[in-house]
């Protein structure tokens, strides 16, 4: 049985937010979000163009295609910078979102997973994802409102635009409206759906395909694709509602078009998903292609960036399970439990006062006996 000190060591390394995880997660998020931000612009503008229209199709409003919207945004002038609205808001939103999501999920995952050396049960992962994702969505709602409004501002007539110039001004204007947490529930449920659905599905797909393909790149590819597809299906209705609540403006009579998340959902069902007008539930998935593609690219690219980070800037595991070989299967007889990282650390710390690997042991006191 591991000592309490060893358990705490693994908890700090894998289940809790720390400076190293904060820096790595945000750098990776900034890279992947910057590369895929044009797709996010297409997604939210597709959702805005869908409002008030009947729907006939699968994943996009008939007549509005993602690449057509992207071409129109680029042709309007401003170059690629047009897709990022304001760099300070993009940076602030990405850092806040990433930090809140990783911290909240890690906090609840640390509570439910008592043995940090192993992955938690699927139901525990779902619970941690729902709680952590919902809290992260509520906390980051103010900055999301500002950023979403800046992305769709050009769709309005000149006189009706909000014209936020930066993050601080946008937050101040939203605060004056009393709308900092408008749509926070939908935003929380969106992140809860993403965090709770994708991790389990990805692990299940990758683990089961390993028995057919072995250690092959196809495991990561198809596992990510399936997880992102399910994450898109369960989270995008909340994303649509969130967008409507974030960007809505008063009607001529002074009232808001939606009174909350439930009211928004009911009105979309009644006016945009009614089969009497050849419509369907796909109205909630306007911009779905851009949403899926962006989420897939973020997840897939992040895994390679994590690999690069682990290989160059992170101490590797000192112990490894049995390796799988195509010719002979698992090497029960010739298994060497110590990794190359262990051997490098052994050489680097061989002359320390504690002797050998003593300083590298999780307890910091016990020496490892090499036989």
Curated annotation (Swiss-Prot):
This protein's major location comes to membrane
Swiss-Prot/TrEMBL keywords: Membrane, Repeat, Transmembrane, Transmembrane helix, Transport
* Segments annotated as Solcar repeats: 16-111, 120-208, 215-304
Segments spanning the bilayer are 22-42, 89-109, 126-146, 184-204, 221-241, 281-301
| Xref: Pfam families | Mito_carr
Give the membrane topology, semicolon-separated if more than one: Multi-pass membrane protein
Which InterPro entries does the annotation name? Mito_Metabolite_Transporter (IPR050391), Mitochondrial_sb/sol_carrier (IPR018108), Mt_carrier_dom_sf (IPR023395)
Signal peptide per UniProt: none
Tell me where it resides.
Membrane
In the UniProt record, which is one GO cellular component term? Answer: membrane
What protein family does this chain belong to?
Belongs to the mitochondrial carrier (TC 2.A.29) family.
Protein's UniProt name:
Macronuclear solute carrier homolog CR-MSC
Q: What is the lineage of its organism?
A: Eukaryota, Sar, Alveolata, Ciliophora, Intramacronucleata
